[in-house]
Amino acid sequence: MNIIKKYLLLALISLLHLPLFADNNSVNSITLARIVFEELSMPSAIFVGEALPCDFRIYNGTLQKIKDYTVNFYLNDEVVSTYSGENLASGNGYNVSIIIPIPETLKQGQYEFTIGFTKVNGETLETVYKSSKRRTVSIVAEKLPRVGVMEEITARWCGWCPRGHVGMEKLQNKFKDSFIGIAIHGYKDPMYYPNYPIKGLTSYPSCVLNRTGHSMDPYYGTESGIVDNFEKVMKVPATVTVTLDATYNNDSSYIDAVAQIKSLINAEDYSIVFVVTGDDMYHDSQIWKQANYYARYSPSSVLADLKQFAYGEKYGKNPFDYHYDNVVIASSYSDGRINQATLDKLTENGTTEAHYSIKMPTETTLTKGIKYDHVYVNALVINGNGEIANAAKVHVTSNTTGIGSLSKASDAQEVVARYGIDGSRVEDSHKGLQLLKMNDGT
């Protein structure tokens, strides 16, 4: 019986990863797998010669205090810096912020960043214990134009969501063409789009910027306002530039999008997402009205740029009529929230082209609020960390050779445009095959 109890005890110890001797602080008695790097955060790109700011959280999941420890930081398995800490109490986590100097000899390119223990409680480990947390860091030598993206969840039934509209408008006004807003409307909205992934966004309203870090309020941000947060992510160097073209097909049921991505680095882990957004979306039915909890308050009791929603002001009703901008209405995401657009590998100083045909929505509750001359395609280029490396936005134009795009002007048929067989417009009649566009749309 004693033997059975002994083996049962040993089995239990093994399952729980408990040290055999609680008073022994040697490395052998500590299960390194229970010392965890819970978070690892840093910019996805820096310039050549710049230092790399790094934030990480270390958690001591053992039953013993860690008196001291040393970790190495690696880029492509080359040690670039070392950090030493002490006094990690059992069952506690600690946040560490450091600046890692990067050798100027490291050239432009993409590097894998890892972190690993080399010493614990004064003992040097025979084998470096590396964390499973890894990041890709790009080092670039050229400053490229940067476009930042806010992805926000909002809803017309959310009474606090009007401040998200203001936050997005503030970013648009300040950053102009360097800002892209993407508003993902919630369930029961006529603008609800179920295919869009909203990882990390749980409360209404909330947003992410360039898909970096945690979610935040789209108006207050995490510091002194959303503008400060956006300025911070805009400081991260871009590794690519994106140019974009988008046109409707003949009956505006599809949009053909073409993006050209010029890259500073070689990369096989980048992807591209196409998102269609609508501006000035409106319908006079009740289900399009925006809820507004700020209507409970007097103008003097709310912040200056929220006064428009206070009692007695322009939008001081609950609910109120509103024209919505930056609304997601279609994308390259499928029903399973899987991105269907593809991107070939990027080459240093090379250009890669991506094509995608996006189906426009057909649900009448949504389409009756769409203004087809206020529709845009956004191309988001995603790096290996899942963050937006750069983006572009373009107004969707009509297919100039598309027969269905012409409005009927009179009952009598007449030629209003001529095109060559290559689709280019010609000014007058000439010998050879021509495509004629008539005033009745044929």
What do these predicted ranges mean?
Residues 78-105:
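Intrinsically disordered, low-complexity Pro/Gly/Ser/Thr-rich segments with frequent PxxP/GP/PP motifs
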Residues 25-37, 139-148, 393-425:
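Residue-level detector of functionally pivotal "anchor" positions at catalytic/ligand-binding pockets or at interdomain
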Residues 1-29:
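Bacterial Sec-dependent N-terminal signal peptides
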Residues 36-43, 71, 83-85, 180-400:
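Short, conserved sequence motifs used for protein processing/export or organelle targeting and
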Residues 140-177:
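Local sequence-structure signature of Cys/Sec-based thiol-disulfide redox active-site neighborhoods
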Residues 58-62, 261-263:
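Asparagine-centered strand-capping/turn motif at beta-strand->loop junctions
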Residues 5-7, 433-442:
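C-terminal tail/sorting-segment detector
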Residues 106-139, 379-386:
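Terminal connector regions
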